[in-house]
Regions:
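Short, flexible loop segments at boundaries between secondary-structure elements
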Residues: 234-273
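Active-site-adjacent alpha-helix immediately C-terminal to a catalytic or transition-state-stabilizing loop
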Residues: 221-240
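A polyanion-binding, active-site-adjacent surface
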Residues: 2-214, 218-227, 260-265
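Generic alpha-helical propensity signal that fires on short helical segments
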Residues: 226-228, 270-275
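Histidine-centered active-site loop/cap adjacent to the catalytic His
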Residues: 275-294
Length: 294
């Protein structure tokens, strides 16, 4: 599939980007940064097909862009002054922007252009990790950075493109992607909003109305079903190494899988189990089969 011409990205007819920005801003106390996030959606919608990471059209007034030579995902930096000094959550003593590598991923949604989707798939990842960006700004991207032409075409994790493409093409779906924990600060998801993250997800479910919810990793299961996955992570790995954990969340069919990161060692067990049932396929084919055949 040619994603540049065949994919519709963040169509407001599927979900209102303004509604998502309002939801995040209200619950995460983003204050004056709300306008920058709304503008970021407009840039992503218009520049998705063919804008390079160093295209000057990505720049927004009062904000910055991380060096595109090392950040192909076109990270938008919203600095402290945009939030305003009267925003203690972000700018006060102990405010979030005093932490390093603060990040948020704006939810995005995609489908084949001019398609008639047969299923609405919500994909929930863990958290918006960042690295090497210092303090004083909120760095904005999207889950797996599919908004960036270069990142999606040269990703270090092409597996996710294969999986999402299968959801759009083979399952004829519209796919909404988000993180369960919305804010990341160096080393961990920012915990100041722990009680809020699930309520934000509940609102996203209302806005998107998914047919199925797909979760990746133990963090997602811990948020949806606190205490179920157990610790250490080995308990979760055993729970999902043959097939995803299945449940209902808010009345929606929910499947939680092992995290698809190439760094996840438990995927060796996943691949072995699938290959045992499907002799002759490769390890990567087995892993993709695990994530896409449900």
């Amino acid at each position: 599939m040619n994603w540049e011409t065949a994919v519709s990205f963040c169509d407001d007819g599927i979900v209102s980007s303004d509604a998502i920005v309002g939801l995040l801003s209200d619950n995460l106390r983003l204050g004056n940064a709300q306008a920058a996030l709304a503008e970021r959606y407009r840039r992503m919608q218009s520049l998705y097909p063919n804008a390079s990471a160093d295209d000057p059209r990505w720049w927004q007034d009062g904000c910055t862009i991380a060096d595109p030579r090392s950040h192909w995902d076109v990270l938008l930096g919203i600095p402290r002054n945009v939030f305003g000094a009267d925003n203690p959550t972000w700018c006060g003593t102990g405010g979030i922007l005093n932490c390093e590598d603060v990040g948020i991923d704006l939810p995005t949604w995609m489908m084949r252009r001019n398609a008639n989707p047969q299923i609405r798939i919500m994909v929930v990842a863990e958290e918006p990790k960042r690295q090497g960006l210092g303090t004083g700004a909120l760095w904005v991207s999207s889950p797996w950075a599919f908004h960036s032409m270069e990142y999606r075409n040269h990703s270090r994790n092409p597996r996710m493109r294969t999986i999402i493409e299968a959801f759009m093409q083979d399952k004829e779906g519209v796919v909404y992607m988000t993180d369960i924990r919305k804010i990341y600060a160096k080393g961990t998801a920012h915990r100041g909003f722990d009680g809020t993250y699930r309520s934000i997800l509940d609102c996203e479910i209302e806005l998107f109305n998914p047919s199925v919810l797909i979760g990746y990793g133990s963090t997602v299961l811990d948020e949806l079903r606190p205490g179920l996955s157990g610790h250490p992570d080995g308990a979760f790995a055993r729970l999902v190494c043959h097939r995803p954990y299945e449940d209902l969340y808010n009345g929606v069919r929910t499947l939680v899988f092992a995290h698809p990161s190439p760094l996840n060692a438990s995927l060796g067990c996943v691949a072995s189990n699938v290959i045992n049932e499907n002799p002759g396929i490769t390890r990567e084919e087995a892993i993709v089969k695990y994530y896409t055949e449900w």
